[in-house]
């Protein structure tokens, strides 16, 4: 048995690779699964009977992944330690009839997903990626990771008051990207193009879940490379850290008093109410089946859940140098200051005093600092999968994350050290 190795700046390098390779939730869970496979995990199908042997397993469902590691000799009532995260990010998603256009321009019809900072998507080179559903019932991932689409902003000469009045965007009229020229709109052009990109025959694709992404790669920023700019940090930063932490704990071979779990859900940005969202039954079903596969009873299930703790890891708000007054006067989380503990007395976050103690112990064991985030009383507080997980499954949950700037922008900003500090905290939590 050995302790897991500590993560360092190399973890941040790897995060940038993960972000680039994961333009959609479907790509993100596929990449997480590939990393877990290399750590000895194996996929199990929800339609198969599960055995109770030790080792690492994972379930894939759409844009969600649940992975867990059963230590040798784990009793059926062994509690779980869960790292929760989400795989989706705000963006523009393709409508069922995507081919459109006007005045000699060919365009793609899109719908707004979640709550993006829409100005950040203007005049940006966009790719297109997602999941294609085929005639034979299978699916295929596709990723056009080159400049394909663009939402052009109106020139200031035609919008003279934009600086004084602020940018006003009509969600239907002003956000449809261009992707070529032509006076004739031909139904099926976009999907035919994607069939070619994916190496499929024409007519094979009968359904799709497609979304835009910025093709600009993540990059270190600043004189001393202290910052990282990139897409989808909310919340692939946590998915990546949770995957790395679970793999490290499983590979260490150390004795574990808990069963470590990674739960990365889809659809957090739209309320989590789906079969792959945190408000669905996926996590509870997987944990229950793990108990029963080891010969457990409902009593064992109740005992296991009663002792379970979940860290809901999602990005939070670092103090903004230009808008510091928007923060609570006495809570100013800084980038590279370590992970943040999120607190809200109205249960927008799930953290309570007991949860704070659990997270503080993990950070102390990992020898890293942590910070506390509380919203300004005059500002509405966002929420996470934390309260949903706590209420739906009756398990103690703590909301944490990494402080970033430009949340929900097409390109967000974090500290270069915070990703590996978070990963080390998660290791200490999963292996107390």
Q: Which residues does each PLM region occupy?
A:
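N-terminal hydrophobic/helix-forming segments and targeting peptides
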Residues: 1-432
């Amino acid at each position: 048995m050995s302790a897991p190795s500590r993560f360092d700046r190399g973890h941040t390098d790897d995060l940038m690779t993960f972000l680039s390779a994961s333009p959609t939730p479907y790509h993100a869970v596929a990449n997480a699964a590939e990393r877990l496979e290399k750590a000895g995990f194996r996929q199990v199908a929800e339609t198969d009977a599960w055995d109770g042997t030790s080792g690492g397993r994972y379930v894939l469902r759409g844009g969600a992944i649940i992975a867990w590691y059963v230590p040798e000799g784990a009793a059926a009532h062994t509690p779980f330690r869960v790292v929760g995260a989400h795989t989706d990010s705000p963006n523009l998603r393709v409508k069922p009839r995507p081919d459109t256009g006007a005045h000699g321009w060919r365009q793609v019809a899109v719908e707004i997903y979640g709550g993006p900072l829409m100005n950040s998507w203007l005049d940006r080179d966009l790719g297109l990626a997602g999941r294609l559903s085929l005639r034979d019932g299978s699916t295929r991932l596709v990723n056009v990771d080159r400049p394909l689409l663009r939402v052009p902003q109106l020139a200031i000469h035609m919008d003279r008051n934009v600086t004084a009045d602020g940018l006003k965007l009509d969600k239907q009229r002003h956000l449809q990207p261009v992707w070529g020229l032509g006076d004739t709109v031909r139904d099926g052009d976009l999907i035919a193009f994607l069939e070619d990109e994916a190496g499929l025959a024409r007519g094979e694709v009968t359904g799709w879940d497609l979304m835009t992404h910025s093709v600009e790669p993540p990059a270190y920023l600043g004189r001393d490379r202290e910052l990282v700019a990139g897409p989808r940090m909310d919340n692939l930063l946590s998915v990546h850290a949770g995957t790395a932490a679970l793999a490290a704990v499983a590979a260490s071979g150390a004795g574990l008093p808990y069963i470590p779990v990674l739960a990365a859900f889809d659809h957090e940005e739209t309320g989590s109410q789906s079969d792959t969202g945190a408000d669905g039954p996926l996590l509870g079903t997987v944990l229950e089946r793990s108990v029963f596969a080891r010969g457990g009873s409902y009593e064992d299930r109740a005992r296991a859940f009663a002792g379970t703790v979940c860290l809901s890891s999602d990005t939070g708000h670092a103090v903004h140098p230009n808008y510091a007054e928007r923060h609570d006067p006495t809570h100013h989380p800084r980038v590279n200051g370590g992970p943040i503990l999120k607190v809200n007395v109205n249960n927008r976050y799930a953290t309570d005093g007991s949860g704070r103690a659990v997270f503080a112990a993990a950070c102390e064991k990992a020898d890293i600092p942590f910070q506390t985030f509380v919203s300004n009383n005059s500002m509405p507080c966002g929420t996470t999968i934390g309260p949903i997980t706590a209420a739906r499954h009756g398990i103690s949950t703590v909301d944490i994350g990494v402080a970033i700037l430009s949340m929900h922008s097409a390109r967000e900003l974090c500290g270069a050290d915070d990703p590996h500090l978070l990963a080390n905290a998660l290791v200490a939590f999963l292996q107390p």
